[in-house]
Amino acid sequence: MTFRLRAAQIADLEQLYEMAKLTGGGFTNLPADRTALTRKLERAEEAFARTYDDLGDDQFTLVLENTETGQVRGTCQMFSQVGQQWPFYSYRMTTLTQHSQELDRTVRAELLSLVTDLEGCSEVGGLFLHPAERAGGFGLLLARSRYLFIAMHR
């Protein structure tokens, strides 16, 4: 069997939709919703077709294709800049330390703070590999392909 990674296309919609149904829901990078998937594929095609180098709000989607059967067996995504169309929320973990001299006691508490510090940063999106292909090292290939893509387009 031979596989290749390539840019996702609108023609991949049905195969990606069938794979999305295998996620069990809640996987935002691969929703089991044809309309949402269509928009993601349109954004990916627009991103790959772009000829200028300015950073935009691009979403790049790659698919893992079995070249013998033409079947899409996995997918992964990258986002050039997050927080451009709507806020990108993340959490910052901090430690709050308080001391009481009267009680001679120090108390530390870990806090999560909602922040938007990562706006404008690139994001490595999720990946999904068809369950039948999970033992062949293809997950590692998909995972690393995102970083290779970013390195090629710095």
Which residues make up each language-model segment?
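Conserved acetyl-CoA-binding loop-helix of GNAT-fold acetyltransferases
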Residues: 107-111, 126-129, 134-150
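Short, intrinsically disordered, charge-balanced linker/junction segments flanking boundaries
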Residues: 153-154
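Residue-level detector of conserved, well-ordered beta-strand and adjacent loop positions
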Residues: 6-9, 65, 79, 125
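Conserved N-terminal entry element of GNAT/NAT acetyltransferase domains
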Residues: 1-29
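Sequence-level motif detector for i,i+2 pairs with an aromatic at +2
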Residues: 3, 59, 70-73, 119, ...
